UniProtKB/Swiss-Prot annotation:
The keyword Zinc applies. This is Succinyl-diaminopimelate desuccinylase. It comes from Rickettsia canadensis (strain McKiel). Catalyzes the hydrolysis of N-succinyl-L,L-diaminopimelic acid (SDAP), forming succinate and LL-2,6-diaminopimelate (DAP), an intermediate involved in the bacterial biosynthesis of lysine and meso-diaminopimelic acid, an essential component of bacterial cell walls. Its EC number is 3.5.1.18. Zn(2+) 1 binds at H69, D103, E166. Homodimer.
Amino acid sequence: MYINYLKDLIGFKSVTPESNLAIEYIDDLLKKHGFKTEIKIFGDSKSEQVTNLYAVYGNGKPNICFVGHVDVVPAGDYHLWHNSAPFKANEQDGKIYGRGVVDMKGAIACFLTAALDLIKNNPDFKGSISFLLTSDEEGKAKHGTKEMLQYIYDQEYKIDFAVVGEPTCETEIGDTIKIGRRGSVNFKLNIEGLVGHVAYPHKANNPLSCLIKILNELINIKFDEGTEFFQSSNLEVTNIDVGNNTSNVIPASVEAYFNIRFNNLHNAETLGQLIEQIVKRYCKEYKVDYKLEYISAAESFIQNPNDKIKDFADIVESTLKIKPKFSTSGGTSDARFVKNYCSLVEFGLLSEMAHKINEYTKISDLQKLYDVYYNFLMEMLTNK
């Protein structure tokens, strides 16, 4: 059934923050199979409204929860897609194409099927199965999983272990389980100089001269050597804007944007202080004014592999005959919110095709993912 569910889900053009009825589809499906469900819409204005779903079957412990998102990134130029239809599932040559198939509607379809099969085959299982889904993971992530977790805990629901269906695997299904994530902090630096003619530099103050010095030092910072589970922290410059299209004018100001992805040896505040010291030193030397802003998108986190995490890894190995590695690589995810409530793993399809034109997954990979999810639920809820 996971293929049918996946094809249906691809058909919903659920570009962040729109659910576009994808969550309502899942809500109806789970209700028909005896789940208690609740849809909540959070957001300060209509343009920011986010649709969220919590659904649970059973009332015992442990409560194993699948956490995911139905929203997808924009499809780009439709003409570059097979059949020019990114929101219509296209099955060919043992693959399924469509926006969101990898990130992460394929994982949702597999866990839906695994959960419903377990309920059908083991009606007296011990514990609970639940789903927490949002339409705002690819965007600001402000009114999605974070708020929904707080809401369900206020309603006295408790999750004992979560599986987040992000595409984690690298070259084959089963090779990677995420148990943490790097942090991310974005910087915006504005430097104010003095506009002038390039022939009279002594009558101007070029803010680019200062910025070049600053960025040169920043990109050469060796933040750390990495840790057991984390790669080294790194800074990337993402944009420089002077608003100057002429070659004979020294610009009045310049803006630069850069991002740091950091491990658990740092936090956003200490990194902000470090960057501020460097910027302040050069701006004083060049006698220019500056404004530095930074916004933390996420702090880093790491979990010690506890028994449930190890159990999940054992299920992956016994099911797929491959020993998974624990990793923290990649971008941020909603796991950063879930970890405040329970232990978790992130495990899904191959990450290579996520967000790309002609995003696809092999049908055989869907079967492998389903097998892992089903066997894990069996292990946790039936001991068979």
